[in-house]
Amino acid sequence: MLSVKIELLEALHQALEKLSPGAGSKAVFESPKVAAHGDLATTAAMQLAKPLKLNPRQLAENLRAELLVRAPFERWVEAIDIAGPGFINIKLKPEAKQQTVREVLSQGQQFGSQPGTGKRMLVEFVSANPTGPLHVGHGRQAALGDAICNLYQTQGWAVYREFYYNDAGVQIGTLASSTQLRARGFKPGDPEWPSGENAAAYNGDYIADIAADYLAKKTVHSDDRAFTASGDVEALDDIRLFAVAYLRHEQDLDLKAFAVHFDNYYLESSLYLSGKVDDVVKRLHDAGKTYEHDGALWLKSTEYGDDKDRVMRKGDGSYTYFVPDVAYHISKWERGFEKVVNIQGTDHHGTIARVRAGLQAANVGIPKGYPDYVLHTMVRVVRGGEEVKISKRAGSYVTLRDLIEWTSKDAVRFFLLSRKPDTEYTFDVDLAVAKNNDNPVYYVQYAHARICSVLAAWREKEGGDVASLGQADLSPLQSPQALALLLLLAKYPEMLTAAAAGFAPHDVTFYLRELAACYHSYYDAERILVDDDLIKRARLALVAATAQVLHNGLAVLGVSAPQKM
């Protein structure tokens, strides 16, 4: 129906131009809030009434008369009604809605996607410190980041996925010292092990695993490097390098199991080694954007919207963490990414203003509001009716690997994407493995498998060819259930566009659940494999199109579309 809507919108623009030159391009179609009011609606008359000094309802009547004589409206529109102060509601003919089936079947996996724009976008997500296993919060971030990448790819963007490793901070030193203690035979609870509220140590069993492999002089491979342990318990730098490589490898395995890949791994340490951090500080100093106070170097970030000036270099000569962040984002800009999105936890909210202030102060041509941020809350895990807080492997939290092993990759992805990122979420493990309609991922996947079963039965019994359904006569698709399904299929491309613009993959989950429910209602109302060949082929074409859209939407989420369940 997208082609039909384009025709109708062009006719609307032409009619508005006739009534008020220059007004046409501003008009859009909306979906009526009440389905009974029609299939499309526009408020163009009410928007134009004031500048034209006309009664909005009378203007709507004039516009209605103009539309009724235009060819696209004569061909595709059944009725145009005026409601309230000047709402224009449009009811489409069944033939208009039926066009969606042809569009879906002809475009296949490309249905809903836009042609390439040439625009480049970088999405940075997960970016976990290599100090422990990925936790459930990282899982939510991985699902969000990957789905947002997929959404923007449907909109024609060239999307680049990047993982930023904070491998130059204090936590890496704690990782090294904890591994060294384990290698020396100590464990949490021993007098030699750091204890207390602010103890600098990692207590999870994974530290013992790292130490054992280090003593065994093993070689570990991470995404872009390999490191062989020396086994020397006194060589703290060797222990640090091995532990980081070990955990990067473990994180790589978790991400692979979650079907998330990255185009690049960017190391924080490279910003120091390349001189990019020093270059940023010099640029800001030379531009007069810094000052000395109490032995520290400060950025005049309040000049750029921050609530207070920020320390860049502490009295001991070390940089605060936001300085390499500014250098990193300048690197993103210099690599040609006009749009950058950072997926981070809500605990990073305070960094947004200072990073953007630093980028503006650097004066390298970066626009205000760069980069975009999507902030998410943490995830609470419930199993057997009780909250799960601790993993033996991690020592203090539930890992992403735990969740995948308890349920499945598909369930974890769908569940973690089913709410707005900034909404608190409880992951119910028992629900995620349930094979019933209460489980949303099962419900959607079952709808797809159910259609595949119908198509398979048709192929087996009659030698049917799904490819031939694109030429089916669709005129039998007249029932309320069929028309509702057709209209919902037609909304898929617009839903994708809106979800991408709002960084809202949860909208895709809502749509898929609604589509699955609509299909199940249709299936219950009309038998597909009837004796009448004309009716049968029309209904098969409709359900084949539905399966394709379910498949496409699940792919955006990184969830499989099984043919059997």
Curated annotation (Swiss-Prot):
UniProt xrefs under PROSITE patterns: AA_TRNA_LIGASE_I
Residue span of motif 'HIGH' region: 128-138
EC top class, as a word: ligase
Reactions catalysed: tRNA(Arg) + L-arginine + ATP = L-arginyl-tRNA(Arg) + AMP + diphosphate
CDD domains: Anticodon_Ia_Arg, ArgRS_core
MF annotations from Gene Ontology: arginine-tRNA ligase activity; ATP binding
Matches recorded under Pfam families: Arg_tRNA_synt_N, DALR_1, tRNA-synt_1d
Subcellular location: Cytoplasm
Keywords: Aminoacyl-tRNA synthetase, ATP-binding, Cytoplasm, Ligase, Nucleotide-binding, Protein biosynthesis
Cysteine disulfide links: none
Segments crossing the lipid bilayer: none
The EC number(s) this enzyme carries: 6.1.1.19
Keyword Aminoacyl-tRNA synthetase: yes
GO biological process, one term: arginyl-tRNA aminoacylation
Domain of life: Bacteria
InterPro entries assigned: aa-tRNA-synth_I_CS, Arg-tRNA-ligase, Arg-tRNA-synth_N, Arg-tRNA-synth_N_sf, ArgRS_core, DALR_anticod-bd, Rossmann-like_a/b/a_fold, tRNAsynth_Ia_anticodon-bd
Main subcellular localisation: cytoplasm
One Gene Ontology term, aspect cellular component: cytoplasm
Keyword Hydrolase: no
HAMAP family according to UniProt: Arg_tRNA_synth (MF_00123)
Family stated for the protein in its record: Belongs to the class-I aminoacyl-tRNA synthetase family.
Subunit relationships: Monomer.
Protein name: Arginine--tRNA ligase
Gene (name only): argS
